[in-house]
A protein has these predicted regions:
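Catalytic cores of processing enzymes, dominated by hydrolases/peptidases
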Residues: 1-105
Length: 106
């Protein structure tokens, strides 16, 4: 927790066992979650925002332990990690985070 103590928003990345290339997004930051989901969907990725087993809504979830007490988590399937869509996930995530950091820079 010391690592994220000075972070306003935390983005946690986890993996789960599944043979389909997909991403499940969770966390309490609904705006960021939908923004990330929109970017991933535009890139052609299979992304789930709701009604999945990893919503990341508990206040003690690592993604919700930053200064703003809300963040997002990316749950990446086994098939996605190391699969053909992995670079697209990385690019989509970086794109959104870069835009956010530019919006926060005076």
């Amino acid at each position: 927790l010391n690592l994220i103590a000075d972070c306003a928003v935390v983005v946690a990345i986890h993996g789960y066992s599944w043979e389909i290339q997909e991403t499940m997004l969770g966390g309490l930051d609904e705006k960021l979650k939908h923004r990330m989901g929109r970017q991933m969907a535009l890139a052609g990725l299979d992304v789930k925002l709701d009604n999945h087993p990893y919503p990341g809504l508990h206040e003690n979830n690592i993604c919700n332990r930053g200064q703003l007490e809300q963040g997002i988590q990316l749950e990446l399937s086994d098939a996605l990690r190391g699969g053909s869509d992995e670079p697209t996930v990385i690019q989509s995530t970086r794109s959104v985070l870069l835009k956010i950091s530019q919006e926060c820079t005076p």
